[in-house]
Amino acid sequence: DEPEREPIGLWGQRHLKYIQKCCKPFFNKMIREHTLYDYLLQIDRDAEEMFSELVKRMAIQEGVSEQLKADNQIEWVGKMNNIRQRATEIINHDIIYN
């Protein structure tokens, strides 16, 4: 029995779809060399780490704090959703669709 592999997360899955469509030779090479799983796992980890750092940094820069969350939860949710969306766009541009 093979040990259970860590599942590829959302970022890795998005990148997989991209390389299947737009980078066929690269995708096929990774399949032949049995390196696709490790590559996608690393993409997923790198993207998740970058996403977390971006969200944290943007929230600090924009004053989206735990105090705001306590004072005005609706405003906090709106601002955090906006920050997450912008961080997602950066990750997509810099890692996923690159």
What do the predicted segments below correspond to?
Residues E2-P3, Q13-L16, R45-E48, S52, ...:
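Anionic, Ser/Thr-rich low-complexity intrinsically disordered regions
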Residues K56-N98:
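C-terminal charged interaction modules
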Residues D1-H34:
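Short N-terminal mixed-charge amphipathic segments
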Residues Y18, Y37-Y39, Y97:
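Sequence-level detector for tyrosine residue identity
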Residues E33-D44, Q73-N81:
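Conserved phosphate/pyrophosphate-binding and hydrolysis machinery centered on Walker-type P-loop NTPases
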Residues D1, D38, D44-D46, D71, ...:
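Acidic-enriched, low-complexity/disordered segments with a strong bias for Aspartate over Glutamate
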